């Protein structure tokens, strides 16, 4: 059978919090089968757990948060969640000694390295996939996102930014998902923001960890980062990274096709909740052997050479 995945060992790293600008220690621990993805704040006494759950997601101006019934939150979970989706990690405990996951370089790549360094362990329990049976679509003005039946995981994302640094030919990206394609083509794409917005937020005591080290920063005319872009279409690739993380908030890799126009965290989450609420539109499936399973979800192989 195709088995659930966790880590082989504990792995730890430090980084900076996007909101506070302070050092954050991140510890990722193996977890038993059927635990799911659990974020944990150890700066609170007693520590507070936040299971990854579409209904717990709140989208703020700066990041995605998970919020519990007491309005306690953990922030900036989206890029780490994308790395978990990319490598198909089903069960993990993620501890931070702060109200937020460190922003690292603004992409999912540092988290991918950490997870691969810890190693991936298969558990003796069947991995459950969420497979689309019907198309579900959500809209917000001219923005929209949909999931439809497809034997694999295919993503097609279009952005529409009228900015000199973002050429019109680099505003759409399509991906046939696999662990390898995620690591090579998506995980390194960084988040982005306007210099004027960062300066304004920092003047109000917000976004204190925001810098050229953790984002693509643009002014009205150009990219300000000395090293430029990692991909000519890095902006849309990062929006796809966000979507992969947002959709994994259900705790399961999705078998289906995701298509979006100008979508963001809030609309991605609205789509996921709409799918989950329409029980006839999806089903959980398991696979007895690799031959039955879509190629998209084969265990990561060549990514270690990346």
Curated annotation (Swiss-Prot):
Keywords: Hydrolase, Lipid A biosynthesis, Lipid biosynthesis, Lipid metabolism, Metal-binding, Zinc. GO terms for molecular function: metal ion binding; UDP-3-O-acyl-N-acetylglucosamine deacetylase activity. The keyword Lipoprotein does not apply. It catalyses: a UDP-3-O-[(3R)-3-hydroxyacyl]-N-acetyl-alpha-D-glucosamine + H2O = a UDP-3-O-[(3R)-3-hydroxyacyl]-alpha-D-glucosamine + acetate. The active site is at 265 (proton donor). Zn(2+) binds at residues 79, 238, 242. Disulfide bonds: none annotated. It comes from the Bacteria. InterPro entries: Ribosomal_Su5_D2-typ_SF (IPR020568), UDP-acyl_GlcNac_deAcase (IPR004463), UDP-acyl_GlcNac_deAcase_C (IPR011334), UDP-acyl_N-AcGlcN_deAcase_N (IPR015870). Pathway: Glycolipid biosynthesis; lipid IV(A) biosynthesis; lipid IV(A) from (3R)-3-hydroxytetradecanoyl-[acyl-carrier-protein] and UDP-N-acetyl-alpha-D-glucosamine: step 2/6. Its EC number is 3.5.1.108. GO terms for cellular component: membrane. The keyword Lipid biosynthesis applies. One of its GO terms (biological process) is lipid A biosynthetic process. Gene3D superfamilies: lpxc deacetylase, domain 1, lpxc deacetylase, domain 2. Its cofactor is Zn(2+). Belongs to the LpxC family. HAMAP family: LpxC. Catalyzes the hydrolysis of UDP-3-O-myristoyl-N-acetylglucosamine to form UDP-3-O-myristoylglucosamine and acetate, the committed step in lipid A biosynthesis. This is UDP-3-O-acyl-N-acetylglucosamine deacetylase. It comes from Yersinia pestis.
């Amino acid at each position: 059978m195709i088995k659930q995945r966790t880590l082989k060992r504990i792995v730890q790293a430090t980084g900076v919090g996007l909101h506070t600008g302070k050092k954050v220690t991140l510890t990722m621990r193996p977890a038993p089968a059927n635990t799911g993805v659990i974020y944990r704040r150890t700066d609170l006494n007693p520590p507070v757990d936040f299971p990854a759950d579409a209904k717990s997601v709140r989208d703020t101006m700066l990041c995605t948060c998970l919020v519990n019934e007491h309005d306690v939150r953990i922030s900036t979970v989206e890029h780490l969640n994308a790395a978990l989706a990319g490598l198909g990690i089903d069960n993990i405990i993620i501890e931070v000694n702060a109200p937020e996951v460190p922003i690292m370089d603004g992409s999912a790549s540092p988290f991918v390295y950490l997870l691969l360094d810890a190693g991936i362990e298969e558990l003796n329990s069947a991995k459950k996939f969420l497979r689309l049976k019907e198309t579900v679509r959500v809209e917000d003005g001219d923005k929209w996102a949909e999931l439809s039946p497809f034997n694999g995981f295919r993503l097609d994302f279009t952005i529409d930014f009228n900015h000199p640094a973002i050429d019109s030919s680099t505003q759409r990206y399509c991906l046939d998902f696999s662990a390898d394609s995620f690591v090579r083509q998506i995980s390194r794409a960084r988040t982005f923001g306007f210099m004027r917005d960062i300066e304004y937020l920092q003047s109000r005591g917000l976004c204190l960890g925001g810098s050229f080290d953790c984002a693509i920063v643009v002014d009205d005319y150009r990219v300000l980062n000395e090293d430029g872009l990692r991909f000519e279409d890095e902006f849309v690739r990062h929006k796809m990274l966000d979507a992969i993380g947002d959709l994994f908030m259900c705790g399961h890799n999705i078998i289906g096709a995701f298509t979006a126009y100008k979508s963001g965290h809030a609309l991605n989450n609205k789509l996921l909740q709409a799918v989950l609420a329409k029980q006839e539109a999806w089903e959980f499936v398991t696979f007895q052997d690799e031959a039955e399973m879509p190629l998209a979800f084969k265990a990561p192989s060549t990514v270690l050479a990346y």
